[in-house]
C-alpha cells in the first residue's frame, strides 16, 4: 500500500519527513514531495503550501503522478468544539468548505456547484485514525466535521458567522476541503487527522504561533501510528 500524507507548512511535515527511511525529495510546481518508507509502508509526503488553491493543485499532482492508495491530511487546526482544548486531535468524518456560497442556485451553504455538500472520510481510515490516537494514549480527541476556508479565523464575528452555518463543526483550517474535493474526483479514500493549535477567535494568532509545534507533534504521533497500522 502506498500512503500519501499532506501537510501545508514545514512545521507540519518536518517530523514526518525525519521519520521516513530512504527519503528522497523532489519539487514540482513549488510543492515538495518526499518519498520514503515507514514501518515497511511506502509513503509519499507532500508539503502543499497554505490555502485551498495550493492544496488542490499539489494534491492533483500527487494523485496523478504518485498514485497513492489512500490520503491522510494532517497538521494544525483551529478549535470550534468548546469541549476540545489546544493540543487535542481532531479526526474528520466529513469535510466541507465554509467560504463557498452559491445557495442562490439551490445548493447548500458551503457546497460548490456540481460537487457534493460534504466530502465523507473513508470509514476504515477513520477507524484506523481513532485506534491510532487511542494507542498514543496521551491526547484528547474528537471526531466530526472539519471545515476549510481561505481565511485565518481570528475575527470573532467571522467565527460566529461560520458557527451559525456549521454548528456541529469540530475544527477549522485552510486546506482539507480542497484535498478532500480532489480525492473525491480521483475516487481516492482520505481522512483528516489534525491537532488544535488555537481556539478560533480567541487570540488565535498568538496561540497559533505558540502552540503550532505542539499541534504538529501530536498530529505526527497519530499519523505515524496510523501508517504503521495500514
Curated annotation (Swiss-Prot):
GO terms for molecular function: adenosylhomocysteine nucleosidase activity; methylthioadenosine nucleosidase activity. CDD domains: MTAN. InterPro entries: MTA_SAH_Nsdase, Nucleoside_phosphorylase_d, Nucleoside_phosphorylase_sf. One of its GO terms (biological process) is L-methionine salvage from S-adenosylmethionine. Substrate binds at residues 78, 153, 174-175. GO terms for cellular component: cytosol. HAMAP family: Salvage_MtnN. Catalyzes the irreversible cleavage of the glycosidic bond in both 5'-methylthioadenosine (MTA) and S-adenosylhomocysteine (SAH/AdoHcy) to adenine and the corresponding thioribose, 5'-methylthioribose and S-ribosylhomocysteine, respectively. Also cleaves 5'-deoxyadenosine, a toxic by-product of radical S-adenosylmethionine (SAM) enzymes, into 5-deoxyribose and adenine. This is 5'-methylthioadenosine/S-adenosylhomocysteine nucleosidase. The lineage of its organism: Bacteria, Bacillati, Bacillota, Bacilli, Bacillales. The gene is mtnN.
